[in-house]
Amino acid sequence: MSWSILELVRNNPDKLKEYIKRRFIDVSLVDRAVELDKKWRQTLQEVEKLRHEHNVISSSIPKAKPEERQELIKKAKELLKALEEKEKELDNIENERDNILMQLPNIVDDSAPIGPDETYSVPIRFWGKFKVYEKDEAEFLSQLKGNRVDYEIIHWKPVGHADMLENVLKLGDTKKAAEVSGARFYYLFDDIVWLDIALLNYAIDTMTSKGYTLVLPPYMLRGEVIKSVIDLDTFKDAIYKIENEDLYLIATAEHPIAALYFKEEIPKEKLPLKYVGISPAFRKEAGAANKDLKGIFRVHQFHKVEQFIFSSPEDSWKLHEELIRNAEEIFQGLGLPYRVINIATGDLGACAAKKYDLEVWMPAQAKFREMVSCSNCLDWQAYRMRIRYVEKGGKKGYVHTLNSTAIASTRTITAILENYQREDGVVEIPKVLKKYLEPFSRAPKDYIYPRKE
């Protein structure tokens, strides 16, 4: 939940219901939250009244006449017992209320397109020259949704990234990985590993040159923390839990960076605080049983560079645009054609009030595929983690948190394999990566060539 949500529960529950309806989920939790919050505030008044009465009587005992003292002591004990019982009742109501509130998603920004799923998301801009196989032109044009873009027709069918990796280049092995680890794992070799490393260094270099602080975060978080950063009920099919430990593997560096100021206060003049984290990402992908079974697009582990900002409330929307521009700059540097879409309300996830996705065109699949997710979470995470800003005069409020992918290495590799392949199976390396490969004598510099048996 967020402070914004708690304010709406108390002052405008109908508005909160409207936001939740936009997400196409049940609004009955709002009524229960309103009921419990009213009960909590009423009980709090009763606690404060009992506490006041107890304090008045307790302070009068030393001054009382001897014949009155015993009666006052008895009355004080009765009030103390009643107070303790009422405080316990208050705690129980508060816990029940907070459990309900923690299940409520973020509010929704008015600029997010309303719709139950991703088909209602709206493309807002395109970039690059798109390679389109001649038989896929009609399908490509249908995905533009009326927008005009620059594209070229190619007359040979591109090879899908999974076959390029394992059958043409012979630089990956998902079959052996499945044998020893299970589905959605992989071995990568030689040039593809160098490409992975170069992509990570390119993203880090780009972001640190903009003044973002580089972070290597913990790869596991305690239950209390991960439940504050995300809606764990929504993510239970995505997050790995360590058996017999109160620890969860992170699904992105967003999670530990968000927790960097867990239960702390930040001087407002220090905001915004901008970070770029690098980490492995671990995902169960339990909800994607039949999606992307081949290749390395949707896997249980990969490397990721993540942007993250702690912001003052008044600056968060401006910084949301900054984050997506940073991601676009990275993909423009790679020369990968893409579109940015404004995500529909039903596909936002609990944390985000608004989200952009950057999707690269994949010529072999004739589809746009997600490479970047960029969210403004307002104060939803900060309230749950108790991260506040403090003004010089002492006034406090909850910070806003924002996050965006910079690079998810394996997905970006799949985009390079499909967009930079030649008809003879050779893959050109994006020129921007050359400087990150040149220091290593065995690393490829310009091309990745198919391996012979």
UniProtKB/Swiss-Prot annotation:
PANTHER family: SERYL-TRNA SYNTHETASE
Enzyme nomenclature, EC number: 6.1.1.11
Entries under NCBIfam families matching the protein: serS
GO CC aspect terms: cytoplasm
Organism of this sequence: Sulfurisphaera tokodaii (strain DSM 16993 / JCM 10545 / NBRC 100140 / 7)
Annotated metabolic or biological route of this protein: Aminoacyl-tRNA biosynthesis; selenocysteinyl-tRNA(Sec) biosynthesis; L-seryl-tRNA(Sec) from L-serine and tRNA(Sec): step 1/1
Keywords: Aminoacyl-tRNA synthetase, ATP-binding, Cytoplasm, Ligase, Nucleotide-binding, Protein biosynthesis
Full protein name: Serine--tRNA ligase
Transmembrane segments: none
Self-association and partners: Homodimer. The tRNA molecule binds across the dimer.
Matching PROSITE patterns: AA_TRNA_LIGASE_II
GO MF: ATP binding; serine-tRNA ligase activity
Binding positions for ATP per the UniProt entry: 283-285, 299, 370-373
